Amino acid sequence: MAASVDNRQYGPLQPPLSGVVRSFKNGPNHRADSPVRGCNFPNSNVDYNNNRPLKSSVKIQEAAAEEMEDSCSEDENENEFRDLIVKGNRELEPSILDHRDEGTADNWIERNASMVRLTGKHPFNSEPPLNRLMHHGFITPVPLHYVRNHGVVPKAKWADWTVEVCGLVKRPAKFTMDQLLNEFRFREFPATLVCAGNRRKEQNMVKQSIGFNWGAAGVSTSVWRRVPLCDLLKRCGILSRKKGALNVCFEGAEDLPGGGGSKYGTSIKKELAMDPARDIILAYMQNGEQLAPDHGFPVRMIIPGFIGGRMVKWLKRIIVTTKESENYYHFKDNRVLPSHVDADVANAEAWWYKPEHIINELNINSVITTPCHEEILPINAWTTQRPYTLRGYSYSGGGKKVTRVEVTMDSGETWQVCTLDHPEKANKYGKYWCWCFWSLEVEVLDLLSAKEIAVRAWDETHNTQPEKLIWNLMGMMNNCWFRVKTNMCKPHKGEIGIVFEHPTQPGNQSGGWMDRERHLEISTESNQTLKKSVSTPFMNTASNTYTLSEVKKHNSPQSAWIIVHGHVYDCTRFLKDHPGGSDSILINAGTDCTEEFDAIHSDKAKKMLEDYRIGELITTGYASDSSSNSPNNSTHGASNFSHLAPIREAPVSRRVALAPNEKIPCKLISKTSISHDVRVFRFALPGGQDQALGLPVGKHIFICATVDGKLCMRAYTPTSSIDEMGFFELVVKVYFKGVHPKFPNGGIMSQYLDSMEVGSTLDVKGPLGHIEYTGRGNFMVHGKPRFARRLAMLAGGTGITPIYQVVQAILKDPEDETEMYVVYANRTEDDILLRDELDTWAKKNQRLKVWYVVQESIREGWEYSVGFITENILREHIPAAAEDTLALACGPPAMIQFAVQPNLEKMNYDTKNSLLVF
């Protein structure tokens, strides 16, 4: 843990952030060509930037006047909230077109560079640094408001946008934005939004959930201008319960991959939707400005006291129904399942569809924000003579008021009651929609004897927070006591101090006492015997630690180390045994590959990895390379230069795009449908027309994308020739949801690719694979040369692509006399990929023979085999076993295990040496 003296900050004494930022003119956060630019609000009541009323229609003013009697408490706070908004904006650096959004469909959106990105480049899921969030206090500036996006932000225009109300209503209608603005009463009020995953990383440190790593800043408060939902539904004549109107569903505009392709949607009960006490609204302004693109421009739902997942952004449809929403995200998101339910059990036993596990209202929660993580409190004559002020926030759900916050410094033996600050007043129904703040002065000498500080809150129903964390599959609603650990340190020669440690740091940032204790726990449970490998001396796995720079040196076949979840592994002796070949390890050697490892490995593989652990990564208070996408939020770094344009190294021009250990961004430039479920995707290379992909024949690439907040990586073999310049092509079979009984949700990556818009970008990594065809019958297999005059090439389904690549390379060389015998199995004729190309090549070249096998023929006159690959089929259509004959195979594991391997053995093939499986 890093310690500093000269530039350290002290929680209650820390300087305001305005010292390192500049004032700027308030305005929308987007560039000149943004589709939301130029939208104005002719009937807005208040210009917050100039603190003066704006023109408003008589109709709206009259409607507002009718509410004056009941809105005193809100109006009393209006000037105070306005001042907070203006002050917060003036202290905030301008948002920028972040280089991390280059090559994505969100590249037009300006964002605050200090936001901590939780899911890589795209989609944009982020939270502000906790200390910045708390600096602004009650009202969060829009650029620092947490963001939860499932996919691409829709490009919307105010003039074209409509919201449809349909279903069980007497008068279905579509409302333009101007109608929503001019024809309905409005009032502004503050509401706190919280992601149900707030504090999830604490759960992930105990056991990995299926969600990404939210820290404790997935919470923000804004002032929202609104159209009451109940008014809109009354205008449309919502039907009664007796006539079946039981639920109100909301649907957004974004196209998402979940469930095989869908919009984001959810629902609430009709009684809630029509309850005026709930203040459920269609919001079109946030903190006195139009909604930002990331927050739902031009209109979104706000349901105070509920989790953020119910507040649909980019709202397009409101449907009154009898049943609750049947949207994929309504069922497969925002659930708290029992702790024993893992992903397999949840799917097998349909836990997702049990209504008792849905999350609506927030639970009671509280967090310690001062002291900051890794803050150092020096112990000297001056600091011990004055109290130290602990601070934090708290919130509850359903409009319930937080009534008490308590702090313990002796593990719950005794509790001290904190001072509460409630900046909001209740609405006329007694509801509280916002967070509050707590503080407690403690003696520094008491901190010296405390091992930890913990906080818990109570609301008006006397609910409080549990002492211990309760894990659940989605990692949601974590509200156990928030604990900050204390340790003694020597920040400078002759000084001692107390260093404070929060449980975790958000995203993939390392740090936090849970991270440290997890490492120690695993070390204790691991085999304590000494281990030795080719590349490392004897070492004790429980005590060895390494810096990132040390690990970086081990990036070769002679010594291949990787970092996963803060542990260091020496994988050198596993290189020859890895099913995907040594490239699969070497491509990440010397790096932190946590996300990629988790994306493509099973639980079994993760357990196997423990055999290769040699120590732990040393973490400091400063950002490492593995967290370079996040700002340096250490409390020891007082300077903030996030308002400056980042200095980036110019990319080195190179003839080939692929480079080991690097992900390269490639833009989708065309998408062609070959059939109802087969697509050809063409991706441009970053180096333009003078650059080749650089993929050796026989090897593959990883396609990387963030889907539903998690990194997804899949191996693909391009079908374009290796000498194509400026682009590569993939032929992909899209596995849609609900088609294959064994895979009801379909293929994650293939559906994601199908949903991509032309112009959007994904990452590519490679080359990978243990087989390389070097030409004229020569192969390199696991680094050793092999030769064949004849090739038996056996493929199943999409496994044709590496076979196709080798065939293509051989036929391109007129001096390559290698003979090829392809047997290609599929379910039906319609499933055969690249058939036209294969048939054309076979007619023109005597070196190539192609035979098809289908499980069932759906057309008359089928002249090839029906059924499965059998010994007889192979004897008729591939060469006999010989020293100069190799078999190449790629397809489903069952085909390789039960059809290819045993039947080749019956033909006397040496399958250990002469069968090469891609």
UniProtKB/Swiss-Prot annotation:
Protein induction: By nitrate.
Presence of the UniProt keyword Transferase in the record: no
Origin: domain of life: Eukaryota
Catalytic activity line of the entry: nitrite + NAD(+) + H2O = nitrate + NADH + H(+)
Enzyme's top EC category: oxidoreductase
SUPFAM superfamilies, per database record: Cytochrome b5-like heme/steroid binding domain, E set domains, Ferredoxin reductase-like, C-terminal NADP-linked domain, Oxidoreductase molybdopterin-binding domain, Riboflavin synthase domain-like
Cofactor binding mode and count: Binds 1 FAD per subunit.
A GO molecular function held by the record: FAD binding
Co-factor requirement: FAD; heme; Mo-molybdopterin
PANTHER family from the UniProt entry: SULFITE OXIDASE, MITOCHONDRIAL, SULFITE REDUCTASE
Assembly behavior: Homodimer.
Known role: Nitrate reductase is a key enzyme involved in the first step of nitrate assimilation in plants, fungi and bacteria.
Family: Belongs to the nitrate reductase family.
The protein's name: Nitrate reductase [NADH]
